[in-house]
Each structure stands twice: as structure tokens, then as C-alpha cells.
Amino acid sequence: MSDLMTTRALTTRDRADLAASILFGAVRVGLGLLWLHEGYVKLRAHFGSADILLVVDGASANSRVPEYFRFVAEHLLRPTADLAGIMTPPTEVTLGLVLILGVFSTLSAVVSAGLLAVYWSSDQLIAQYPIMALLSVGVLVGQGYSNRWSIMTLVRRRSTHQEEG
């Protein structure tokens, strides 16, 4: 990035890198905003154990839900419905904030894809989940570029600048 800060003309490669960093950074932030929204909606709706139990009961009666998820729902989610109900909204909000800030972006994209897989397995589909899945893949594909505009990079740049100055 320091090469881009000099007075020399940008090369085609510099322009491509800059464009990719803007694109994949926007993908990361967009995914973060969607997760932030998901968590916010659940917080406002007072999401809790009753919602988790609704998913568990729905999974046992729904032929579209895979057998492995029915097993997980009955033996893991049902006994921990209180904890899962409490933790789901803050998990989604935290995931959104971490992606927006660009902290642990690769891990966050994997967690995002994993949560979406769990939601899909339970047949809890909403319109933005396919978009969120594509954005999760986008963060993973562009991981070398998506963090150029992150809080961690800005902190590193600032400390490097202070050391030089």
C-alpha cells in the first residue's frame, strides 16, 4: 500500500489491486451489515428459547429437514434452548461487527457460512441468506484484498507512520 502513496503513476497492477481491495472490502462490509441486521431484528423481537424450540419442533415435523439436523435439533438444541436463544442474537451482532471492522475476516466468513448452513438445514430460509452465502464465499475468495480497508490495517498504518515520523 505504501507504493500507492508515492507520487509515481499507478501501474495497471496497482489499479487492479486497488479495485480488488475496494470490491472485496465492500463485500466484507456488506456481509457484516447483513449479519448486524439479522441480530438486531432478533434482539428487537426478543428472540429466545421459544424461538429455538419452534425450530426444533418444526424440524421434527418437516420432511425437508435432513435427518442429521433432526438429530442435532433433538439432542443438542432442545436441551440447550435457553442458552441458544440467548446467544443467537449477540452472536449475529458480533459477527456483523467483526466483519465490518475487518477483524478475523477469514474466520468470520467461515463462521458465517457455517451459521447459514445450520439455518438452511433447519429449513429456516429467508431471502437474504443466499446473498449472505455468496458474500461469505466472496470474503474467502478475496481474503488477500478484503482486509486492506480494515480497522487492523488502519492501526498498523498509523503505528508505522508514527515510527517513521
Language-model features: where?
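Extended, low-polarity transmembrane helix blocks
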Residues: M1-E67, F71-T94, L101-G165
